[in-house]
């Protein structure tokens, strides 16, 4: 692959991970990300089974482990905070309810970016506006006005992929909703979490708190059933209103956690969904 010019759309997890392997094989890689910088926040990512081997082969085992949440375990509670069930991180050889290697999405993104930033070109605050491909390459027009030519273009821009819509068609054709919405955001650690995750469930909904590497803060977690997201995934204010509506009347610490919703720096909400496609490439354009 020496000398092949590859454009990757998306600088979260999949994009920088792909860039790592492409660069190792000699490709010239550019990653474009519409956000002005790496996006913080998001859920915890558990590395299990083959994922541990992939991390090792990338030479990132030490970096990933250093950024782990160091969660000791989890327990479920009733409305009064009484413990119902306890799960330890070392259960089942470290692959139980809490994985031995557990890292926040934003921290994993930072590890992958730091690993590739010196050998990969990153363009933040821009996006692919138009592309035209022929037998020899792909001409790309960026929203910022730049025009460049690449040998391959790969979409790693997630559930709401703009590249997928541009090349394959509208998202409604491919996205299958699985009936659940998740939300995450950091809050001040005023709950004495120490190293334990707490989970409370009520009427098909859940609320929880988990420790994060910054011991002064904690991660709030919510889930609720929904046939669709119901709001624009880019409209954060509407997403926060939706979360408040769906969590209304829920017991335990839920009202207290929701008081921090407006001042959190890293709110994230999205539906749980699956992308189903007959093919993942079209000429010189592919998707992860």
Language-model features: where?
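Glycine-rich Rossmann-fold phosphate-binding loop(s) that bind the pyrophosphate
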Residues: 10-12, 34
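Glycine-rich FAD pyrophosphate-binding loop
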Residues: 23-42
């Amino acid at each position: 692959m020496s000398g092949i010019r590859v454009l990757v759309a998306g600088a979260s997890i999949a994009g920088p991970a792909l860039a790592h392997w492409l660069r190792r094989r000699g490709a010239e890689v550019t990653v474009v990300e519409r956000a002005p910088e790496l996006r913080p926040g998001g859920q915890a990512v558990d590395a299990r089974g083959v994922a541990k081997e992939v991390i090792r082969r990338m030479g990132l085992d030490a970096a990933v482990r250093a950024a782990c949440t160091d969660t000791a375990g989890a327990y479920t509670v009733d409305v009064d905070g009484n413990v119902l069930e306890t799960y330890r991180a070392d259960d089942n050889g470290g692959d139980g309810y809490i994985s031995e290697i557990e890292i926040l999405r934003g921290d994993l993104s930072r590890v992958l970016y730091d690993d590739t930033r010196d050998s990969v070109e990153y363009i933040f605050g821009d996006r692919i506006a138009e592309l035209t491909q022929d037998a020899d390459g792909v001409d790309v027009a960026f929203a910022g006005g730049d025009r460049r030519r690449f040998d391959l273009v790969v979409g790693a821009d997630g559930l709401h992929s703009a590249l997928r819509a541009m090349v394959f068609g509208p998202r409604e054709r491919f996205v299958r909703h699985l009936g659940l919405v998740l939300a995450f955001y950091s809050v001040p650690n005023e709950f004495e979490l120490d190293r334990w995750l707490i989970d409370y469930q009520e009427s098909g909904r859940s609320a929880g708190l988990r420790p994060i590497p910054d011991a002064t803060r904690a991660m709030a977690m919510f889930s609720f059933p929904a046939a669709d997201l119901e709001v624009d995934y880019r409209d954060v204010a509407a997403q926060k209103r939706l979360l408040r509506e769906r969590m209304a009347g829920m017991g335990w610490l839920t009202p207290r956690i929701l008081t921090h919703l407006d001042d959190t720096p890293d709110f994230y909400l999205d539906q749980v969904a699956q992308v189903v496609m007959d093919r993942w490439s079209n000429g010189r354009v592919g998707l992860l």
